[in-house]
Amino acid sequence: MKVLFIAGFGPIATDVEQSRRLYEEALGITFKKEDGDYRHTEELKGANTFAVWPLEQAAESCFGGAEWPDDVVRPQAWLEFDVDDVAEATREMEERGYKLLVSNRTEPWGQVVSRLVSPEGLLVGLTMTPWMRPGEHDVGA
């Protein structure tokens, strides 16, 4: 597996309003708001994307419902690595014994993703993010 870049990172919020006050009001970060309370920016130098991802939306992405299962460590943050080949990266992680929550799924917005919870409690994605790869088509799909 070859990691190409960090596609994005940020907190997973259980109290979106408190997170909004910290990041928008106190730190002055301007976010775009989409899909309910999902807030993101591609304008912070040094990051492709920084986003506050509501836990309910992370649960929907991983499990198909708004509730995070009690038997899976609840993540505090998310981190996505764009890789050269998501299918191969997924296979490698499974061979190493990692339990994937999502395998090789294409999200409604076009990103291909496999996800797992890291030992530190991060929701880690192995991704192919088309809009971050100008000139490339169907990479990792």
Where are these regions (language model features)?
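A short local loop/turn or secondary-structure capping micro-motif enriched for an aromatic residue
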Residues: 57-61, 132-135
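N-terminal beta-strand motif that seeds the catalytic metal site of vicinal oxygen chelate
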Residues: 1-20, 33, 76-81, 127-141
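Core segments of cupin and vicinal oxygen chelate
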Residues: 4, 10-57
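Positions that flank functional sites
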Residues: 38-39, 108-109, 136
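Conserved beta-strand in the GNAT
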Residues: 50-53, 115, 124-127
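Vicinal oxygen chelate
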Residues: 13-17, 72-123
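Aromatic- and Gly/Pro-rich amphipathic surface segment
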Residues: 59-74
